Swiss-Prot record:
One of its GO terms (molecular function) is nucleotide binding. The keyword Nucleotide-binding applies. This is Nucleotide-binding protein PSHAa2277. It holds the Pfam family DUF520. InterPro entries: DUF520 (IPR007551), UPF0234-like_C (IPR035571), UPF0234_N (IPR035570), YajQ-like_sf (IPR036183). Keywords: Nucleotide-binding. One of its GO terms (cellular component) is cytosol. It comes from the Bacteria.
Amino acid sequence: MPSFDIVSEVEMNEAKNAVDNANRELETRFDFRGVDASIELNDKVIKLKAEADSQVIQLFDILASKISKRGMDVSSLELQDISRAGKNVFRNVGLKQGIEKEMAKKIVKAIKDSKVKVQAAIQGEEVRVTGKKRDDLQEAMQVVRSADLGQPFQFKNFRD
């Protein structure tokens, strides 16, 4: 019986390359000359650091443009609150990895509401979709792509 898995993963190599490109642009930008500003990638968190709120927002815009150029979806970024420490302003940007229970339930509901003849089951941080025909599975993929759930999804482990 054909099946595939719906997952939500961020390629860390691409994220690292996007951060490196953003730092390279940061060095050449005129509005950041003489400013203590940086973008760092630690595990699954990108740390933006600057001297003012507006500069942190600009840093995020630079990062978002570089991430989209690398072929990653900007909706995989999770903005957190701006915090201050001394003269610096920080903002952490989380990378969404895996599918949370609530999001998995929304995916299963969207597939069931579409009346496609497939079964969707939540398995940890992924959703397994099985069906009798490959066409049904491709239709289920279209349903998930068209449902605006605020997170990018990849389809892996396609078995016939």
